[in-house]
Swiss-Prot record:
Induction: Constitutively expressed. It comes from the Bacteria. Pfam families: Actin. It comes from Haliangium ochraceum (strain DSM 14365 / JCM 11303 / SMP-2). May be a dominant-negative inhibitor of eukaryotic actin polymerization. Belongs to the actin family. This is Bacterial actin-related protein.
């Protein structure tokens, strides 16, 4: 098989710490989206591991949480359990997408955490895809750059608000500007946990993993970002109340928790943290970049990730940035309806591009030079 062999449509995988998105590059949307989690067998009652093999993946693992130990193979954007991640990939190829990985180039997005501190993970991923799944070609792409690429950009600022990882990443001509790369302390999990604390103040106990998954759904269904917290708090209580039907049939009423919860994105001090809030982090990241880039970064801010879906978040961030940005740098936020899937969509678009063939590492090159060649691609 020569390097010029024409393969089937590339498989695109965005392995988020919480959710994995996968599909073929010629599709408009990810063909499969499922929890990036595995279940391992446990001995009921003693909580001891009997067999370390992965028994189930994704929603099936969550559904069997009473009888299995749940583990995330990817944590904060970094693969920490390669055996479990291989099981997730097998599930992706053979059960979720029904494809033969040896017939498709495979494109995987990469978290900025890997870019900055864990680059050897890229070699491990490359070996896994070639040796275990016999991929004909492999490409590893920056998820931040792919988020921009989905919007037709190669330079801009990516604000990614995920469940396990949130960051601000300046990108110039497809490459992360390391000086401005900033990881945010508040992420989706911390916001969910904060909401559970607020509910506890009202006598509602949600502390188990199953209960926290319910709190997460409450957060995603009812919470929003207030444009002005003081004014929102002064409103009539009835005007901000909303109800949520619990699985047991009871009705949960939320009041100011709806906007107090995501406020930690802008004010991490609510959690006792001294890290900068979202607006400060964006401004600081841009100002750490070359002055010649700053206006372009302010003008091309792409917001992505599940946490970006809070109603009111983009409007609040736009307003606060306009108050902080230099007069010669108009602020423009791109908040697409499909922003949760931007890294996947950008990678799919890139895989359809003519330049992809020169970017992907072929099996022949891998066998001649090894996995280290992935750094040159």
């Amino acid at each position: 098989m020569s390097d010029s062999y024409v393969f089937s449509s590339p498989i695109i995988i965005h392995p988020g710490s919480d959710t994995l998105q996968a599909g073929l590059a010629d599709e408009e949307h990810p063909g499969s989206i499922f929890p990036n989690i595995v279940g391992r067998h446990k001995l009921a009652g003693l909580m001891e591991w009997v067999d370390q093999r992965v028994l189930c993946v994704g929603q099936e693992a969550i559904d069997q949480s009473a009888t299995v130990l749940l583990r995330h193979p990817v944590w904060s954007g970094i693969v920490g359990d390669w055996e479990a991640f291989a099981a997730v990939l097998r599930h992706t190829f053979y059960r979720a997408l029904w494809v033969a990985p040896e017939e498709h180039p495979i494109v995987v997005t990469e978290s900025p955490h890997v870019y900055r501190s864990f680059q050897l993970r890229r070699e491990q991923l490359t070996r896994l895809l070639f040796e275990t799944f016999h991929a004909p070609q492999v490409a590893v792409c920056s998820e931040a750059a792919m988020s921009l690429y989905a919007c037709g950009l190669d330079t801009g600022l990516v604000v990614s608000l995920g469940d396990f990882v949130s960051y601000v990443a300046p990108v110039h001509r497809g490459a992360i500007v390391d000086a401005g790369l900033t990881f945010l302390e508040p992420d989706g999990r911390s916001i969910t946990e904060y909401l559970s604390r607020l509910l506890l103040e009202r006598g509602h106990v949600f502390t188990s993993p199953e209960a926290l998954r319910l709190v997460r759904d409450i957060k995603e269904t009812l919470c929003y970002v207030a444009d002005d917290v003081a004014k929102e708090a002064a409103r009539n209580a009835d005007s901000v109340e909303a109800t949520y039907l619990l699985p047991n049939g009871e009705t949960l009423v939320l009041g100011n928790e709806r906007f107090r919860c995501p406020e930690v994105l802008f004010h991490p001090d609510l959690l006792g943290w001294e890290s900068p809030g979202l607006t400060d982090a964006v401004c600081n990241a841009i100002m750490k970049c070359d002055p010649s880039l700053q206006a372009e970064l302010f003008g091309n801010i792409v917001v992505t990730g599940g946490g970006s879906l809070f109603p009111g978040l983009s409007e609040r961030l736009q307003r606060e940035l306009e108050q902080r940005a230099p007069a010669e740098a108009p602020v423009h936020l791109l908040t697409r309806d499909d922003r949760r899937h931007l890294p996947w969509k950008g990678a799919a678009r890139f895989a359809r591009d003519a330049q992809f063939a020169g970017f992907a590492l072929t099996r022949q090159a891998y066998e001649r030079h090894g996995a280290e060649l992935i750094y040159q691609m």
